[in-house]
């Protein structure tokens, strides 16, 4: 067995209506301009996306959107998200949706502060700093 230390600070918020506090938590963790990343189907139909946007607006936070996540997300959307973060001055990536949205948003957050190709991370290259990231 290899010796190691694992440290993973995580903050969980659960409960009915908690999406209405999204803006509060984004601010608390240092976000000021947010990339909202989502698939598009149920998050729109349920009104979740609108409630998250309203919460961000209520806290005076700016945001840009990148929808269209499909199951087993494609790298093209990740590259698009990375460029959007860089060009728009985004400092917080917020995933609104399920597993594929979470996967691609983490890749966007890692790639937005990295000078190389985000795919390097999937080949074992270490990340030397972190980007603010959240999931709803």
Q: What residue ranges belong to the model's regions?
A:
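ATP/NTP phosphate-donor binding region
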Residues: 1-92
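Glycine/threonine-rich beta-strand-loop-alpha-helix active-site module
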Residues: 76-136
């Amino acid at each position: 067995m290899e010796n190691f230390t694992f440290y993973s600070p995580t903050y969980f918020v659960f409960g009915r209506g908690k999406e209405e506090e999204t803006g509060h938590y984004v601010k608390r963790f240092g976000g000021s301009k947010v990339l909202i990343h989502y698939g598009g189907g149920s998050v729109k139909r349920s009104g979740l996306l609108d409630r998250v946007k309203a919460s961000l607006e209520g806290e005076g936070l700016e945001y840009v959107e990148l929808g269209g996540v499909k199951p087993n997300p494609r790298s093209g959307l990740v590259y698009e998200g990375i460029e959007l973060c860089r060009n728009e001055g985004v400092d917080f990536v917020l995933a609104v949706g399920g597993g594929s949205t979470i996967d691609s948003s983490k890749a966007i957050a890692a790639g937005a502060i990295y000078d190389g190709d985000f795919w390097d991370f999937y080949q074992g290259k270490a990340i030397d700093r972190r980007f603010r990231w959240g999931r709803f």
